[in-house]
Amino acid sequence: MVDYTEGSGKQYHTGVGPSDIGKYVILPGDPKRCAKIAEHFENPRLVADVREYVTYTGTLCGQKVSVTSTGIGGPSASIAIDELAKCGAHTFIRVGTCGGMQENVLGGDVVIATGAVRMEGTSREFAPIEYPAVSDFGVTAALKNAAESLGISHHLGVVQCKDSFFGQHEPEIMPVSYELENKWQAWLRMGCLASEMESAALFIAGQFLRVRVGSCFLVVANQERAKKGLENKQVHDTEIAIKVAVEAMKELIKKDCNS
């Protein structure tokens, strides 16, 4: 493979090297959320800002930790986790937003993904479609414990991952509307909790790379409730999910240090 770093020791896309990051990394999509997440660290500093990838590094519980944005969707997320793993990171928590699907998943709740429907394309370049996209049990348990200790309403279950945001929200305008709408009904009947765009790629890439990956999301709103004329409050305070991710990472660090 061509060395696109030209011997710099820095990863080509993310711009980080092994000395820049911790072994524990939080992965938001939005670069602007990185500074907000880094406020939870001790002595955070900006270490890289390249394309959609912004990275801050600090400490939690005495251990070096980082936050790196991934941008939107599976392709950029898989690049991030691949390059971060090459730099020595082994534990990842994806934190972001999602849209609720089941009626009881309300705006302001947190969804913790146990697995993901592989409706996106990135994961197919890692593993056959029959291979399941599942989260790491230890990370998922830590996320659940964090949500419970913080008193945050939360749900554990499968999320649906797609590549087209508007294919979900306006399927009727798409040439393949029949497929999108029929599959959406299938995901609902199977009990999918929410829809988002990165977990499937991250779970599959993580399994290939032998690293731990979990995901938690703030539910912004629920389009199924809106369709049925039910109350459908919108919540955009991502700090709700960020707190869950940070507390979960603290638990994982403490357990690792004591094992």
Locations of regions flagged by a protein language model:
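His/Asp/Glu-rich mid-to-C-terminal helical/loop segments that flank catalytic regions of hydrolases
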Residues: Q223-S259
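Short acidic/polar active-site loop segments enriched in Thr and Asp
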Residues: H90-T91, L193, R212
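Active-site rim beta-loop-alpha module in soluble metabolic enzymes
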Residues: A133-G191
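Flexible, glycine/charged-enriched surface loops at secondary-structure junctions
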Residues: P44-D49, G151-V158, L252-S259
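Metabolite-binding pocket within alpha/beta catalytic cores that recognizes anionic/polar moieties
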Residues: M1-A142
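Zn-dependent metallopeptidase/amidohydrolase metal-coordination segment
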Residues: A200-Q234
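Generic structural signal for well-ordered, non-membrane alpha-helical segments
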Residues: L27, P31-C34, T70-A77, P132, ...
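Generic non-transmembrane alpha-helical segments
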Residues: A142-L150, A205, V244-K255
